[in-house]
Amino acid sequence: VHVSCEQSHEAIRRARQKGMRVFGEPLIQFLTLDDSEYLNKDWEYAARRVMSPPFRDKIHQDGLWAGLQAGSLQVVATDHAAFTTDQKKMGVDNFTLIPNGTGGLEERMSVLWTKGVETGRLTRNEFVAATSTNIAKILNVYPRKGSLVEGADADIVVWDPKISKTISVASHKSVLDYNVFEGFQVNAQPRY
């Protein structure tokens, strides 16, 4: 379940305490962007950020980070739905026709590392759990995936926290003509 607000997180936490098999995944966008993005006077800028659920008030972010730390939220996703600006314009006269979703797949790991690990919101182990181990467990492919043990698939990334870059539409690999993380300075990139 995509989790964008503290009320959803709390419902998931209570359900898990009762033994229900339910999982929560805040999107990297929900951890780092907020509903002020929709107040931009440039219609295209705001429309590019339309997704479901929407960005929420910044007040919800601390609770989502805490959920990742505590394990009541399990993974960080992106809901990568690469709708271009022209596609988003389908809703120029009717908000309900704006295709929901935005990019984020390419940026997820670096933004999570920079805004999570480097700020002390997540440990390195919590980062690995939220990006690899937990999803493998949820999908019942652990320990073949999501672990470094003998006999497991060798799906690894060499992560270098010393490689920095500024996120930009000019250099990203996505087909999108915008990037919701435009201008973010991030540290840590896959080396291999």
Predicted segments — roles?
Residues 48-59, 98-104, 178-188:
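A short acidic, glycine-rich active-site loop
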